[in-house]
């Protein structure tokens, strides 16, 4: 059994299928891990969710910020924008079933055999990996319970920027969600910084650094993440794997086979799109 880990799909269903064919993925034998953001901005979010759900236990995903945003749209908390390209999914007869399945997916996964963990955006340098797993479970318990709508309504915002283990309620949950699904840069003390969208080489490293460059980062396990398409899979230290290579932006979809660390890539077949 091979373990394949693919970066953010964002509804790029055709590219995902081509990539799996290229790697000779066997759905009844192999496992497919996905770094989150299955949906949003790409043309086939509905087909992507249906396919991944159909894989059953062969698929292991974590939730990304776009997946959480989709859940909020479905609950009427936010409106569906044309740029999200989610209308086909939201109007599908199996939408409720698909999004219930999505809501019960985790924010953090640890492989039971290999020494790696997978999250969408990263692990806060103010946490250990073991703490991150526990904090993710706090959010999952609410997301999978009766109070999930309240959580989805109040998860938006950039504060608090620094972790305080004594914090409670939505501030605590928002930090956990932001660290696991939105984080790119941190201040040197490990607090979250959401205002810079530049590539790392264009930033002042005496003020902010990529989260994986903060020296307090726990690397007791390898860390696999997506989210940060501008990295194009490069620039991380040993044991840190960035797999979002910006397929939805016109670049490519990338997938790592863990056993031999072979990387597979398939170029986007559509016209390049631009962020607004």
UniProtKB/Swiss-Prot annotation:
Pfam families for the chain: Metallophos
Keyword presence, Ion transport: no
EC numbers for this chain: 3.6.1.41
SUPFAM superfamilies, alphabetized: Metallo-dependent phosphatases
GO molecular function terms noted in the UniProt entry: bis(5'-nucleosyl)-tetraphosphatase (symmetrical) activity
Superkingdom to which the source organism belongs: Bacteria
Keyword entries, A-Z: Hydrolase
Keyword Repeat in annotation: no
Catalytic activity: P(1),P(4)-bis(5'-adenosyl) tetraphosphate + H2O = 2 ADP + 2 H(+)
Role noted for this protein: Hydrolyzes diadenosine 5',5'''-P1,P4-tetraphosphate to yield ADP.
Protein family (similarity comment): Belongs to the Ap4A hydrolase family.
PANTHER family: CYTOCHROME C5 (PTHR40942:SF4), PTHR40942
Official protein name in the record: Bis(5'-nucleosyl)-tetraphosphatase, symmetrical
Gene: apaH
């Amino acid at each position: 059994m091979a373990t394949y880990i693919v970066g953010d799909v964002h509804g790029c269903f055709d590219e995902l299928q081509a990539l799996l064919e290229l790697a000779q993925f066997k759905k009844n034998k192999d496992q497919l891990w996905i770094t989150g953001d299955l949906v949003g901005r790409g043309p086939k979010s509905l087909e992507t969710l249906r396919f991944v759900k159909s894989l059953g236990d062969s698929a292991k995903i974590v939730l990304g910020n776009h997946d959480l945003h989709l859940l909020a749209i479905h609950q009427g908390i936010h409106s569906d924008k044309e740029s999200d390209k989610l209308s086909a999914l939201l109007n599908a007869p199996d939408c409720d079933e698909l999004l219930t399945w999505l809501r019960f997916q985790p924010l953090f996964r640890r492989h039971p055999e290999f020494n790696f963990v997978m999250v969408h955006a990263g692990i806060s340098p103010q946490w250990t990996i073991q703490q991150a797993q526990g904090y993710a479970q706090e959010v999952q318990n609410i997301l999978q319970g009766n109070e999930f709508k309240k959580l989805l309504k109040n998860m938006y915002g950039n504060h608090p920027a620094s972790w305080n283990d004594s914090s409670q309620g939505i501030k605590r949950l928002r930090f956990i969600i932001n660290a696991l699904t939105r984080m790119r840069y941190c201040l040197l003390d490990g607090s979250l910084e959401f205002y810079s969208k530049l590539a790392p080489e264009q930033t002042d490293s005496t003020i902010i650094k990529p989260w994986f460059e903060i020296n307090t980062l726990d690397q007791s396990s390898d860390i696999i993440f997506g989210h940060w398409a501008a990295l194009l899979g490069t620039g991380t230290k040993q044991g840190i794997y960035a797999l979002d290579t910006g397929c939805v932006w016109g670049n490519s979809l990338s997938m790592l086979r863990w056993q031999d660390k072979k990387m597979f890539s398939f170029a986007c077949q559509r016209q390049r799109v631009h962020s607004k």
